[in-house]
UniProtKB/Swiss-Prot annotation:
Gene Ontology CC terms: virus tail, fiber
Protein name per its UniProtKB record: Tail fiber receptor-binding protein
Function (record text): Tail fiber protein located at the distal ends of the fibers that binds to the adhesion receptors on the host surface, thereby determining the host range. The phage can alter its tropism by modifying this protein. Variants are expressed through a diversity-generating retroelement (DGR) that creates mutant copies of a template repeat and replaces the end of the tail fiber receptor-binding protein with these sequences, thus changing the host range. Milliards of variants of the fiber receptor-binding protein can be created with this system.
Record carries keyword Lipoprotein: no
A Gene Ontology biological process term: symbiont entry into host cell
Organism annotation: Bordetella phage BPP-1
Oligomer and partners: Homotrimer.
SUPFAM superfamilies attached to this UniProt entry: Bacteriophage trimeric proteins domain, C-type lectin-like
Main location class: virion
Compartments it resides in: Virion
Pfam families: mtd_2nd, Mtd_N
Record's keyword terms, sorted: Host-virus interaction, Late protein, Viral attachment to host adhesion receptor, Viral attachment to host cell, Viral receptor tropism switching, Viral tail fiber protein, Viral tail protein, Virion, Virus entry into host cell
């Protein structure tokens, strides 16, 4: 038997302030973990078997996102974050600034930790410029909005900036597969920042400066429900918008979710004019600018632009007989109305975060009916 090698040992608390000498090895007796020291970093660097740390993403606070907005165009990764990249553990012992590209308003950015120890943002969701999917690991992202969130109940401004509630990481994110274009509402659920666009099959359900889907410009038919990728639905009925949201792992909001996501919009006010055809842009002939309808959470055109279908039924009941109003998919008996929320451009003082219409059947379709998606909040261990 060879002579045993012994290391100095100490508790986790003792290790917290111990820097040791360069290349010194100690044992954390509380965690039964080997710790390597560099002579400068308090606490050193705990080691574990590679098969146990592969794909590791560790945060100091599991209940919070790993990033902090530090300015309109700046953000940092939080101290205590540890990320495995290309077989290496990258540890951030202090809040570290994220290297930013030139940011473009209305764009989503992925955040990568790279095997050279840097953290950077990029609009490419496969790999950042100068790196590959092997040498850089996507760990989160954010939306660079065309204006601010509401500070009170009067909407936001038009200064482009990072929406702090859009920050997400791989363990703190929307439950929907694609986190882009979403914002966290009151820590409870995620909402699409923008109204649904016509070309959701390629754009997703929430994208800046695209044609809004409504009763006069209906969305492309879901390829999961019989669509061919190019044909659109015949109208803007509730059935079709609800089907689109299901396609993307989302749903239409209920009344409580809507009043929450729209909080901060300018109340009792509508866009005016003759139409609101584009996300994040003033309506045609608008008397009120798009930004005054931004909510506290950064939901754009939250009210006063289009009535948006809700995920609730009630109000006026249908006829006490079977009615074939489902697009050839069965008949309904005494069906109540499908809810609509928020108010449209022609609603004058009727619009707001609690504005609701409980009159329209789910087969109704008008140019001022649109939709916005929501989904659950996901926190992973």
């Amino acid at each position: 038997m060879s002579t045993a090698v012994q290391f100095r040992g100490g508790t986790t608390a003792q290790h917290a302030t111990f820097t040791g000498a360069a290349r010194e090895i100690t044992v954390d007796t509380d965690k039964n973990t080997v710790v390597v020291h560099d002579g400068a970093t308090a606490g050193g660097f705990p080691l574990a078997r590679h098969d146990l740390v592969k794909t590791a993403f560790i945060k100091a606070d599991k209940s919070a996102v790993a990033f902090t907005r530090t300015g309109n165009a700046t953000a940092s990764i939080k101290a205590g974050t540890i990320v495995e990249v290309n077989g290496k553990l990258v540890q951030f012992t202090a809040d570290t600034a994220i290297t930013m590209p030139a940011l473009t308003a209305g764009t989503d950015y992925a955040i990568y930790v790279c095997d050279d120890g840097t953290v950077r943002a990029d609009s490419n969701f496969s790999a950042p410029t100068g790196y590959t999917s092997t040498t850089a690991r996507k760990v989160g992202g954010f939306h660079y909005a065309p204006g601010s969130n509401a500070a009170a109940q009067a909407g936001g401004n038009t200064t482009a900036q990072i929406n702090e509630y859009s920050l997400w990481d791989i363990k703190f994110r929307p439950a929907a597969l694609d986190p882009r274009g979403m914002t966290l509402v009151a820590g409870a659920f995620w909402a699409d920042i923008y109204l649904l666009g016509v070309n959701h099959l390629t754009d997703g359900t929430s994208k800046y400066n695209v044609t809004i889907a409504d009763g006069s410009a209906s969305p492309k038919k879901s390829t999961k429900f019989g669509g061919d990728g190019s044909a659109a639905y015949s109208d803007g009925a509730w059935y079709n918008f609800a089907e689109v949201m299901t396609h993307h792992g989302k749903r239409l909001p209920n009344y409580n979710e809507f009043q929450a996501l729209a909080f901060g919009t300018t109340e009792a006010t509508s866009s005016g004019g003759t139409d609101v055809p584009t996300t994040g842009v003033n309506g045609t002939g608008a008397t009120s600018a798009w930004n005054i309808f931004t909510s506290k959470w950064g939901v754009v055109q939250a009210s006063g632009c289009l009535w948006t279908w809700g995920n609730e039924f009630g109000g006026v009941n249908g006829a006490s007989e079977y009615t074939a109003n489902t697009g050839g998919r069965g008949s309904v008996y005494a069906q109540p109305a499908a809810a609509l929320f928020g108010g449209a451009w022609n609603g004058t003082s009727l619009s707001g975060s609690r504005a609701a219409l409980w009159y329209s059947g789910p087969s109704f379709s008008f140019a001022f009916f649109g939709a916005r998606g929501v989904c659950d909040h996901l926190i992973l261990e």
